[in-house]
Amino acid sequence: MTLDDAVQQMTDRIKAACGGAEVKTVKMSDEEARLSVYAPTGDMQKIKDVTFQPAIDLLNSDGLDIQVFVYDKDAPPLKG
């Protein structure tokens, strides 16, 4: 599997868990990507649940490191 395929697979899982989630992807290398997910508070755990094991599986089976960070899109910006 390619990194692009893995990112698409994870994005599809995220969108299935929360259609309103916004996903921003940064490719760090040919084998590593970071997905920043902005979702409502009520959907954050659901997204974590549907992406955790697949991310581990991609790392173990394909050597692809897909990191998924989930943020509350309704939280006020940090001060300081």
Residue ranges: model-predicted function:
Residues 1, 42:
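Charge-dense, low-complexity intrinsically disordered segments
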Residues 37-41:
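Short beta-strand-to-loop capping motifs
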Residues 10-14, 45-64:
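Short, non-transmembrane amphipathic alpha-helical segments
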Residues 43-45, 76:
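Residue-level signal for secondary-structure boundary sites
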Residues 60-80:
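A short amphipathic beta-strand at an alpha->beta junction
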Residues 15-35:
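Short edge beta-strands and adjacent turn/loop segments
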Residues 2-17:
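Short amphipathic alpha-helix segments
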